[in-house]
Amino acid sequence: MKKIQFFDTTLRDGEQTPGVNFDVKEKIQIALQLEKLGIDVIEAGFPISSPGDFECVKAIAKAIKHCSVTGLARCVEGDIDRAEEALKDAVSPQIHIFLATSDVHMEYKLKMSRAEVLASIKHHISYARQKFDVVQFSPEDATRSDRAFLIEAVQTAIDAGATVINIPDTVGYTNPTEFGQLFQDLRREIKQFDDIIFASHCHDDLGMATANALAAIENGARRVEGTINGIGERAGNTALEEVAVALHIRKDFYQAETNIVLNQFKNSSDLISRLSGMPVPRNKAVIGGNAYAHESGIHQDGVLKNPDTYEIITPALVGVDKNSLPLGKLSGKHAFNTRMEEMGYTLTEQEQKDAFKRFKQLADAKKEVTEEDLHALILGQSSESADDFELKHLQVQYVTGGVQGAIVRIEERDGALVEDAATGSGSIEAIYNTINRLMKQDIELTDYRIQAITAGQDAQAEVHVVIKNDKGAVFHGIGIDFDVLTASAKAYLQASGKSKTASKQADFEEVK
């Protein structure tokens, strides 16, 4: 039975999803959940890319105690040095170095010859090996690279000290047959194939990321890279939950085992979906809302008689608890804290007190507080506590001729209260125009989405917005409230606050 490592890049490649932007606290929260999930390696970011990314990688490296943390780096000494500095507090640091090997990338992006690429790989892998025990090399766009040159580049990296070789299907171009053959070729040509770890990194442009990752495992890969929910650039990455469950359900075929705690997938998926603002499609494999629903009468009859007739995956396997009892206003602190632990949250004593207080307020307004309500409660508490601006007052009124007016008062982190008013063609536009005046920013709303957290007339509204500022930076905001307009204002204020804070940090860096 072979052991397959899981390498999660939700915080790096996953964050490249348009409209997704995690802050430091959110990234730490995700990383801690990935640790509970049993992920072997967490790719925390690209330290050289920005001061913010450096600080995120540094914070995650310090917070994680039971798995490896890695950072991305180009074949540049400065990148490697920056990664070393960011990861110095990690219990088990690794580095991930990449350089393109396809002709189109070398000619048009790198403007380097094959000889220059090989020399760069040799030098920088050797340089990194002096600083890290585990060095992973990725020949970017491997599946469109000349096969002989790809093998030469991989051999060069191994000879220079690489301990992990990752084969990226950067643009989602390959198929399972071709990808499996590529790993067979590597196994035949690379003399140290069994002495180091080979990995796959697949994209889903043609809908084959999971199939390609499994083909790689079938043909010798011992590490799989991907993200939770398959989020990522363009069509996304390999969905790790799909690979993990496939290996478990078809252990007879793949003969593989992992460190993954399968019943933590639902918690992981829910957390990342809410923080990213990307809902999980209902028909998504493994963790979609319809994954265990049966509409056909024949199917329903079969499942009632024996679930094995139509279910190869039980809901409980991935952490879907259909029998979880809702909490109510008579539920005590112990029951609440126990449920938080079951849902995967790690809260400090003060956070527990604050969350329980909010829970009691919520329980007074709702007959039953469901697990979805609790996820929203923790998400709201986490996001609002990190905000520099808090909504204190909102008033909307009809003016004339279909025009709406809004008065908004916010409190800044230093306690200062500011208030302004504006109009718009509707309530939402009036509120957002007012917030723009208060924040003194030129903001474009690019996405607005509202959903009910639970069923019923007493459901809370959860609003997600995506905005773009005048510098082209994109920010995501979440607002939760029983009142739709208040939830909308909270979401927009949060996103605008992130934009304003980021602009201040950028200005500070320029002054430095």
Curated annotation (Swiss-Prot):
SMART domains: LeuA_dimer. Its EC number is 2.3.3.13. Pathway: Amino-acid biosynthesis; L-leucine biosynthesis; L-leucine from 3-methyl-2-oxobutanoate: step 1/4. It comes from Listeria monocytogenes serotype 4b (strain F2365). GO terms for molecular function: 2-isopropylmalate synthase activity; acetyl-CoA C-acetyltransferase activity; manganese ion binding. Catalyzes the condensation of the acetyl group of acetyl-CoA with 3-methyl-2-oxobutanoate (2-ketoisovalerate) to form 3-carboxy-3-hydroxy-4-methylpentanoate (2-isopropylmalate). Residues 4-266 form the Pyruvate carboxyltransferase domain. Its main location: cytoplasm. It comes from the Bacteria. It catalyses: 3-methyl-2-oxobutanoate + acetyl-CoA + H2O = (2S)-2-isopropylmalate + CoA + H(+). Gene3D superfamilies: 1.10.238.260, 3.30.160.270, Aldolase class I. Keywords: Amino-acid biosynthesis, Branched-chain amino acid biosynthesis, Cytoplasm, Leucine biosynthesis, Manganese, Metal-binding, Transferase. Its cofactor is Mn(2+). One of its GO terms (cellular component) is cytoplasm. It is found in: Cytoplasm. One of its GO terms (biological process) is L-leucine biosynthetic process. PANTHER family: 2-ISOPROPYLMALATE SYNTHASE 1, CHLOROPLASTIC-RELATED, HOMOCITRATE SYNTHASE-RELATED. SUPFAM superfamilies: 2-isopropylmalate synthase LeuA, allosteric (dimerisation) domain, Aldolase. This is 2-isopropylmalate synthase. Mn(2+) binds at residues 13, 201, 203, 237. Residues 390-512 are annotated as: Regulatory domain. Belongs to the alpha-IPM synthase/homocitrate synthase family. LeuA type 1 subfamily. Homodimer. Coiled coil: none annotated.
